Each structure stands twice: as structure tokens, then as C-alpha cells.
Amino acid sequence: KYFQLEKNKHLLLAGLFSGLAMLSKYSGAFIWVGVGLYVVLYSRKEFKNPCMYLSVIISAVCLLPVLIWNINNEFISFTFHGNRVGFFGEFHPEYFLAELVGEFGYNNPVNYVLTIIALVALMKGAKFIDVLPKRLILLLSVPMILLFWFFSLTRQILPHWTAPSFVLLLVFVAAQLADKYSIRDNSFIIPKSIIASFSVLCFTLILGATEIKTGFIPLNFSERSKTVQRYGEGDFTLDMYGWRMIKPEFEKIRSKSITDGVMKETDDMVALKWYPLANLDYYVAYPLGIDMYGFRDPSEIHKYAWINKERGDLQLGEDYWFLTESFDYYEPDKYLKPYFKKII
């Protein structure tokens, strides 16, 4: 009889998709945090529903690949992410302020303000959304925001970590606008706030694409960033520019070195950090038919700790190419000299 109820079918599907969300990103666990709080606070009768427990089991089964992989790899994924956050540490109000400013920009400033307006209206008793979905949405979103805000008091975190919660809170914005601008006489009104939000999005995309392609906005803020070795340092837009330009120039240097007998055609490449390691692998090493290896601890090279082994790992006595960018420069002598007889 339980499976004949439409509600329970949806509950089981929710368990499946929640499990897939957690399989994609650990923060998907906040879905079950929100649901658990909702059941405890407002719907305890669900504790008598077998489908609730079955839904939890379905989510847990989805996580089995993650659990098995971590068991086989000393739980390195859990420890890595655990080190990125923490409950204790020295108080840094500037980190918290940076988080708020980052959220404001990442989530579209107009949307951020509209979200605050909608939340304030709800706190004052506005009735533009039914009470049950209001409670569930708040419990699904607010815990994540509060937890990451707490982390940001003691360490630097990334503003997009709270983005899933802010996306969910946009339901309140939509409900408030729908209540304010109800359709009358088949007339269709686009609220000015929606036009403003869309305009900010379009402006940001156009400005960003133009800056990435042309660099017309000078983002070299220090004298060091104007030198040859450090040119562009601090310009985050360079992360998405110029990767396809590297291979042709490197190919000329590589061909000459092979012709002169300095390097061999089979010599592979190394890099020191997961970024730009993967970029150089995709745009340079792979097209040239050579392997790219990470050359540091797993915390620095991430997945390449395993990719290295799949490719045969670094070999003693072999020569390797090393590429580094001026905007993210790594001094070869500082990082590589202890491991190589000669750097040229």
C-alpha cells in the first residue's frame, strides 16, 4: 500500500536524486539535513513511513562508490575536504567580509538583493508562498549558508560554496514577484527587477568575454606583475586565455631541442600543481603525444597522484619538460633543482 501512494513514489525518487547529488558533491548531504530537520520539526509522522527509511538507504547506496574508493585510498578525499574547513581557528573578520562580498557578486547582485527583500518580507509575515514549502526551502538552504559563514570566520573559503542555497532561495523571489505582478486580462508584465537582473548577467558575460579575449582592462596591480617572469600576475582573467597559443610555440622549442640532441622525442612533461597541470596536459602534452605528470604531494596535484601511476610514474634518470606561466610563475631552481642533475 505504501508504494501505491504518489507521495511515497516521489519520496523514493527524492532519495535517488539526493544520492546522485551527494555522489556529485558532498554538500549534497545538506538535502538530507534539511529534510531531517523538517521531519523532526513539522512532520514526525514520517518516522512511521517505511518509504522514508528506504529513501535514505537509496541515497546511501548511491554513495557506495565514494566510500569504497576512500577505503582503498586511506580516506584521502574526506581528509582533504576536512582540511579545507574547520570549526576552530583564529578569528578573521576580513575572511567573513570577503565571503559576503563574493556571494554578492557570484549570485548576481540584483538577485542577492531581491533574495534579502523576500526573506525580510517573510520574516514580517508576508503570505506570498504557502507555509509548508516555505519551511522546507528554508531548512534546505539556510543550514548550508550558516555553516559556511561560520567556517569563513576562521579561514578563507570560496563564495560559490553557498550558491546552491541561494539558487533555492530564488523560489521566494519568484513567488513574491508572481504575487505582486499577477497576470490580469491576459497581459504579461516583466518586472523591472527581472530586467535589471538579466541586464547584469548579459553585461557581465559580454564584459568578461571581451576582457578574456582582449585584456583591455589593466589588471596588473603591482610592479612585479609587469616584469617578464611575472607578467600578468594577479590577473584572474588569464586563467581562461591563451592556452591554445602555447603548443605551437613550445613545439618549435621542443623540435629544436630534439634536433640538437638536448632532449629526446619521448621525453614527457611535469608540472607542480593541479592547475595548470590539467590545462597543459590537455592543450600541450596530449596533442604532442607525450605524457604529463604531477610533481608534488597529492594535496597539490590532486587526481594526478593516481594518473601518474596509470602512466607509468616518473622514472629516475629521465629528462622532463617543465612549463610555467608568468601569471602563475614557479621558479624551476626553487622547486625542481633538488631532483634533477641539471636544469637548462
Question: Can you annotate each of these PLM segments?
Answer:
Residues 232-234, 238-344:
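Luminal/periplasmic acceptor-recognition loop/helix of membrane-associated glycosyltransferases
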Residues 155-189, 193, 197:
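Hydrophobic/aromatic-rich transmembrane helices and adjacent perimembrane loops
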Residues 1-10:
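Membrane-interface transmembrane helices that cradle and orient dolichyl/undecaprenyl
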Residues 4, 37-42, 151, 174-178, ...:
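Membrane-water interface at transmembrane helix exits
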Residues 20, 31-134, 140-155:
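Transmembrane-lumen/periplasm boundary regions of multi-pass, lipid-linked membrane glycan transferases
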Residues 180-222:
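Signature aromatic-anchored transmembrane alpha helix within multi-pass, membrane-resident enzymes
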